[in-house]
Amino acid sequence: MAGNKPLGKKIRLAKALKQNRRVPMFAIARTKGSVKQHPKMRHWRRKNLKK
């Protein structure tokens, strides 16, 4: 992808990058391991973002 992106697309990509984090360790420990993943995890090659 080009280095020069429109601002809107750049903001959307940054938001998607921040959302795509694992569940924190304190949350896994607090729920005794019942919560290990969250449903919004996205792999960059399998799922495309909306344009």
Swiss-Prot record:
PROSITE patterns: RIBOSOMAL_L39E. It comes from the Archaea. GO terms for cellular component: ribonucleoprotein complex; ribosome. Disulfide bonds: none annotated. Pfam families: Ribosomal_L39. Gene3D superfamilies: Ribosomal protein L39e. The keyword Ribonucleoprotein applies. Residues 33-51 have a biased composition (Basic residues). Keywords: Ribonucleoprotein, Ribosomal protein. One of its GO terms (molecular function) is structural constituent of ribosome. Residues 32-51 are annotated as: Disordered. GO terms for biological process: translation. Belongs to the eukaryotic ribosomal protein eL39 family. This is Large ribosomal subunit protein eL39. It comes from Methanococcus maripaludis (strain DSM 14266 / JCM 13030 / NBRC 101832 / S2 / LL).
